[in-house]
Regions:
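A short Gly-Trp-Pro
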Residues: 1-6, 12-145
Length: 145
């Protein structure tokens, strides 16, 4: 099957022939800290659907430095430092941030807003997409591997 999506850097390639299982604009404080962006486009894939070429070249560190034992690890290239993906230690998902992880501008747009917190004082998004304080209500985490 041909690849629908491909990203990464000159040393590590990630690719998938499957659609993401979730595709949202994230408003969480962790994404803001890690990316430096006010909101972050995040796409989740089933763990086995996002393949990695040359995984031995990845450095892994906790995605959330305030919860270093959490399940998500930020994977970066050991040669150039490019962020490659988020890997779930439980084997459920792999996630990408298309605009900083080497994906082209044709990547599908986010379908909703996740982790919006009105207490931050940031105006509620009004672009016509649903807004949730967590992930969308019908999202089901894949089973652990």
């Amino acid at each position: 099957m041909s690849e629908k999506f491909s990203g990464g850097c000159d040393h590590i390639n990630t690719h998938s022939s499957s659609d993401p299982i979730d595709n949202h604009t994230c408003h969480c404080s962790v994404c803001k800290r890690v990316t430096g962006q006010p909101t972050t486009h995040v796409a989740f894939f089933n763990h086995g659907d996002l393949e990695v070429d040359n995984p031995q070249k990845m450095n892994k560190q906790p995605f959330n430095d305030q919860n270093p034992d959490g399940p998500l690890e930020l994977c970066t290239c050991s040669e150039c430092g490019t962020p490659i993906m988020l890997d779930d230690k439980l084997g459920r998902i792999r996630a990408i941030v298309p605009n900083i992880m080497g994906y082209d501008e044709g990547f599908p747009a986010p379908t909703y807003h996740a982790f919006y917190d009105p207490a931050t004082g940031v105006p509620r998004p009004d672009d016509g997409r649903e807004v949730y304080e967590g992930l969308r209500k019908d999202f089901v985490w894949p089973p652990e591997k």
